[in-house]
């Protein structure tokens, strides 16, 4: 799933931007030497978050920063653990890791830009906020999406940002040093978005037509970026619409106080006494080489570092406001549009990522993602696994239960709670574009067996139109039919989607047909949402 892009041909390209410098990128060519897109990879948008800047908000580059240089190779990625959650998955040797990871990658369609400039998609990668990279891999390479004949041409920008403990470590020690020291990865994304707004016109983009989107944790991040703007009218209102692929917000993130246990565990893992002062603990943690930190993440009991409720980027009423329609009212008043949806087998990847190793471990693994009281409520809601004589069969059932809980919380329930809240808030249905993907191109068989249907993130080849990866000629009309509406939405925020009720979505069925169908998971998704809301006294 994470192979390097296929480049059939290329040539240098140069962009001379007054006040910024001369940027040397790469023009991607097709097999006949025709230009498909221009690629500029590894553009720095913030100072390196290293040394004393580890676990600090990103720092903007100084005025007059000279961007002159070569941008024809991908730069370094945030250090991260290796999740072996897909069959025969191996690390890509082309990926290079370093704490210095705050770079943007930009792809620009070849050919003459529209009079108003290209629409822009600021796309945040997935990976649980623990792993991933800003589209260094084949499945998200937009060269065919941007080539002649594509019905959805726009500029694509993807930010590298801090992940796992580098991006989401939280604790009182950090707040004592600086009350704004939390959710560093979200602030990275925001600064990259601000950079895009400021500079994208130099690449041919329309800064007044920027969508934010993402897959999985990138969708989660995109939602938080949208929430941040709607709750901070003093900030630049950059985002015109949001593309939320397979993720939403199902629960209020843990408080900093709840995350203190995780901070303490990390300190103890490296022999740092908890009785030291906050400054001393941070000094010792900052002295640890980044690779040592990354290599020990999966050795922690609490190994997943997620967003925290800090009262700043993540306000304490986020889930409540989504649930009761308050956020929906803000979206209604702003006039923004959203695409929200899923694939037909979200379950499989979640069942195989950090799966429980025993019945007792089930609570711990769910608690890695959600607050303790929510974990208890979820385990009471779902049918319990009965005792079995065959231990292997029993563990498989525990793993399946884990996958069901997490796929509901991350996708199936969270998106339905969001949609319901938008409707409660008065967002008109013509601004909510629901979808479900059941179609998979034949090329995907080399990544996942056909029986896995369309697994989580298995639709990336659709959204990025990976012709070069093996889309068959007879499948191209299916892809183009879907992308036509997507391209219209990216350009104008409007398209003929076909849905007329909240409980309907647009389905790209397994046979390649597009139809509008009733949502069979609607009631269950809202029931899961009510269970979580009940924990917080919201029902």
Swiss-Prot record:
Cell compartment(s), UniProt: Cytoplasm; Nucleus
GO molecular function terms listed in the Swiss-Prot or TrEMBL record: carboxylic ester hydrolase activity
Coiled coil ranges (UniProt) are none
> What UniProt keywords apply to this chain's record, in alphabetical order?
Cytoplasm, Hydrolase, Nucleus
This entry's Enzyme Commission designation comes to 3.1.-.-
The active site is formed by: 216
**Main location as per UniProt:** cytoplasm
What's a GO cellular component annotated to this UniProt protein? nucleus
**Membership in a protein family:** Belongs to the type-B carboxylesterase/lipase family.
- UniProt-recorded name of the protein: Uncharacterized esterase/lipase C417.12
Tell me the organism: Schizosaccharomyces pombe (strain 972 / ATCC 24843) (Fission yeast)
């Amino acid at each position: 799933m994470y192979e390097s892009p296929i480049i059939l041909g290329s040539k240098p390209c140069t962009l001379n931007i007054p006040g910024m410098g001369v940027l040397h990128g790469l023009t991607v060519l097709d097999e006949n030497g025709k230009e498909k897109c221009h690629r500029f990879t590894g553009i720095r948008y913030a100072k390196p978050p290293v040394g004393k800047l580890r676990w600090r908000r990103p720092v903007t580059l100084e005025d007059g920063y000279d961007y002159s240089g070569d941008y024809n190779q991908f730069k370094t990625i945030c250090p991260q653990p290796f999740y072996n959650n897909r069959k025969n998955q191996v690390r890509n040797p082309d990926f290079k890791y370093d704490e210095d990871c705050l770079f943007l990658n930009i792809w620009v369609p070849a050919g003459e830009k529209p009079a108003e400039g290209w629409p822009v998609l600021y796309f945040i990668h997935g990976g649980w906020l623990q792993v991933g990279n800003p589209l260094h891999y084949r499945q998200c390479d937009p060269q065919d999406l941007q080539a002649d004949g594509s019905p959805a041409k726009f500029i694509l920008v993807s930010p590298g940002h801090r992940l796992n403990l580098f991006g989401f470590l939280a604790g009182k020690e950090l707040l004592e040093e600086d009350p704004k020291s939390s959710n560093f990865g979200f602030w990275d994304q925001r600064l990259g978005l601000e950079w895009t707004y400021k500079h994208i016109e130099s690449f041919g983009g329309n800064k007044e037509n920027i969508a934010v989107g993402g897959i999985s944790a990138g969708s989660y991040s995109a939602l938080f970026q949208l929430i941040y703007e709607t709750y901070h009218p003093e900030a630049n209102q950059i985002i015109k619409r949001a593309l939320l692929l397979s993720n939403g917000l199902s629960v209020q993130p843990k408080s900093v106080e709840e995350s203190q246990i995780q901070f303490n565990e990390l300190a103890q893992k490296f022999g740092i006494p908890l009785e030291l002062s906050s400054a001393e603990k941070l000094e010792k943690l900052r002295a640890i080489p980044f690779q040592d930190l990354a290599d020990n993440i999966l050795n922690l009991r609490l190994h997943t570092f997620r967003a925290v409720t800090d009262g700043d980027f993540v306000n304490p009423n986020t889930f409540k406001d989504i649930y009761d329609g308050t956020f929906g009212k803000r979206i209604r008043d702003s006039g923004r549009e959203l695409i929200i949806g899923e694939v037909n087998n979200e379950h499989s990847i979640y069942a195989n990522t950090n799966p429980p190793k025993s019945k007792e471990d089930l609570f711990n693994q769910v608690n890695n993602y959600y607050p303790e009281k929510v974990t208890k409520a979820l385990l009471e809601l779902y049918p319990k696994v009965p005792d079995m004589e065959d231990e292997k069969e029993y563990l498989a059932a525990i793993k399946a239960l884990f996958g069901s809980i997490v796929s509901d919380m991350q996708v199936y329930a969270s998106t339905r709670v969001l949609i319901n809240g938008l409707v409660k808030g008065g967002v008109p249905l013509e601004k909510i574009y629901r979808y479900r993907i059941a179609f998979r191109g034949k090329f995907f068989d080399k990544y996942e067996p056909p029986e896995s249907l369309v697994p989580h993130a298995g639709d990336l080849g659709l959204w990025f139109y990976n012709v070069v990866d093996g889309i068959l000629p007879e499948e191209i009309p299916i892809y183009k039919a879907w992308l036509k509406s997507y391209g219209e939405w990216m350009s104008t925020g409007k398209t003929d989607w076909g849905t007329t009720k909240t409980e309907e979505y647009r389905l790209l069925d397994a046979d390649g047909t597009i139809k509008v169908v009733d949502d069979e998971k609607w009631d269950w998704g809202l029931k899961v949402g009510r269970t979580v809301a009940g924990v917080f006294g919201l029902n």
